[in-house]
Swiss-Prot record:
InterPro entries from the UniProt entry: Arg_succ_lyase_C, Argininosuccinate_lyase, Fumarase/histidase_N, Fumarate_lyase_CS, Fumarate_lyase_fam, Fumarate_lyase_N, L-Aspartase-like
One GO cellular component term noted in the UniProt record for this chain: cytosol
This protein's name: Argininosuccinate lyase
Gene that specifies this protein: argH
EC number: 4.3.2.1
SUPFAM superfamilies reported in the protein's UniProt record: L-aspartase-like (SSF48557)
UniProt xrefs under CDD domains: Argininosuccinate_lyase
Pathway: Amino-acid biosynthesis; L-arginine biosynthesis; L-arginine from L-ornithine and carbamoyl phosphate: step 3/3
Record's keyword terms, sorted: Amino-acid biosynthesis, Arginine biosynthesis, Cytoplasm, Lyase
Length: 458
């Protein structure tokens, strides 16, 4: 007798090598609890449509409850001979309750079953991810609020550009994460569509009522085409794309944390619990966590490319290729969840060094644009003002001082429009306060945005 439920068609058993190569139980068993959820809803629907009787349903519920306990306690024995999580659970159920377990699969295929399991699992992961994104946003908001008036150099091309508030810089990532959360919510809408009832590819001849199952499982919509329902994994690709963007944003922040922690910048310090030392260099304190986040972003992006490549040449409907969707999908969710959890804690352990930040502003002529704007407001065309300020910067650079440190008579040598009120715009703090408009870096605007975001996240 063959172990396979489909073995009646074949003249010889599957080879051991093929069993090992094709079995997915090693990784898809993490879907077990969601598989049981789907089966219980399917059984309830079969009972309400007259396919199962009350006794069958009671036996299935009892058996599944026992199996769920075995899974949670680690007592269940998974068999690669049974290929996957679905057949392992079905065999265990049949061993426990007999023929009622064999009737459970009526009107269903593993094709729509696994698609349902993945969507149920992914829906829950997205809920966790959205909560973790908001937790990280809150940690960044705390930093932003504490540092609304902390001035630092803003960069373009990694060259000092203009003064910005450190709080404003943190708010930039709050905004990015906000869009990430919107993408996750939008993705969840398409994940939350039920394929169950599509059967293998063409539907079923049994009098099923998919609306019953969808309501029991909390699906907002039902997949309307059986071929599409079992064969596409665009929802998994979409999730991985959204996850990739979160990781890209965290990778960018990680790069900045790494730079800012280095002695050449000295803008911040990261708590010791997120760093490691060197086996040979006693003085080292390495920012391993942000470095690893930067590295893991490539891992998630790689999963996105892998899933797209997996789907690109498959004809309808289901193909065994789709077994390869789970490991990258699982790892993407795991990596993102772990990263978000550690990142929020790490940002709460960041120590800001305002004096070093301000000193860096003073070394890069960060208020040059403010001087140009000052001249424009006095009536000089902007292009002329740009040239005048460039000459002043060159002079200050040669003298080894900041623009704000040039004497008034020297500044007036570049333009007679310059008066003693110029120093009000040449200080970093003056530059910040001058940009007091929606989206600007002024401390007042930073506090406004912090308040707005706290209300949105409440």
């Amino acid at each position: 007798m063959h172990d396979k439920t489909w073995s009646g068609r074949f003249n010889e058993p599957v080879s051991e090598l093929v069993k090992q190569y094709t079995a997915s139980i090693g990784f898809d068993r993490r879907l077990a609890e969601w598989d049981i959820q789907g089966s219980l809803a399917h059984a309830q629907m079969l009972k309400e449509t007259g396919v199962l009787d009350e006794g069958d349903l009671a036996d299935i519920r009892r058996g599944m409850a026992e199996i769920l306990e075995e899974i949670r306690s680690g007592k269940i024995e998974w068999s690669s001979d049974l290929e996957d999580v679905h057949m392992n659970i079905e065999r265990r159920l049949t061993d426990k309750i007999g023929d009622a377990g064999k009737r459970l699969h009526t009107g269903r295929s593993r094709n729509d079953q696994v698609a349902t399991d993945i969507r149920l699992w992914l829906r829950d992961q997205i809920t966790v991810i959205q909560s973790l994104i908001q937790s990280l946003q809150t940690a960044l908001l705390d930093l932003a609020e504490q540092n609304a008036e902390t001035v630092m150099p803003g960069f373009t091309h990694l060259q000092v550009a203009q003064p910005v508030s450190f709080g404003h810089h943190m708010l930039a990532y709050v905004e990015m994460l906000g869009r990430d959360n919107e993408r996750m919510a939008d993705c969840r809408c398409r994940v939350n569509r039920m394929p169950l009832g599509a059967a293998a590819l063409a539907g079923t001849t049994y009098p099923i009522q998919r609306e019953i199952t969808a309501e029991l499982l909390g699906f907002e919509q039902i997949c309307q085409n059986s071929l599409d329902a079992v064969s596409d994994r665009d929802f998994a690709i979409e999730f991985t794309a959204a996850a990739s963007l979160v990781m890209v944003h965290l990778s960018r922040l990680s790069e900045e944390l790494i730079l800012w922690m280095s002695p050449r910048f000295g803008f911040i310090d990261i708590a010791d619990r997120f760093c490691t030392g060197s086996s040979i260099m006693p003085q080292k304190k390495n920012p391993d966590v942000p470095e690893l986040v930067r590295g893991k972003s490539g891992r998630v992006i790689g999963h996105l490319i892998g899933l797209i490549t997996l789907m690109k040449s498959q004809p309808l409907a289901y193909n065994k290729d789709n077994q390869e969707d789970k490991e990258p999908l699982f790892d993407t969710a795991d990596t993102l969840i772990d990263t978000l959890r550690i990142y929020a804690d790490m940002m709460r352990g960041v120590t800001v060094k305002p004096d070093n930040m301000r000193a860096a502003v003073m070394q890069g002529f960060a208020t040059a644009t403010d001087l140009a704007d000052y001249l424009v407001k006095k009536g000089m065309p902007f292009r002329d003002a740009h040239e005048v300020v460039a000459q002043a910067v060159r002079h200050a650079d040669q003298a080894g001082v900041d623009l704000s440190e040039l004497p008034l008579e020297v500044l007036q040598g570049f333009s007679d429009l310059i008066a003693d009120d110029v120093y009000g715009v040449l200080t970093p703090e003056g530059s910040l306060n001058a940009r007091n408009h929606l989206g600007g870096t002024a401390p007042e605007q930073v506090r406004f945005q912090v308040k707005r975001w706290r209300e949105m996240l409440a």
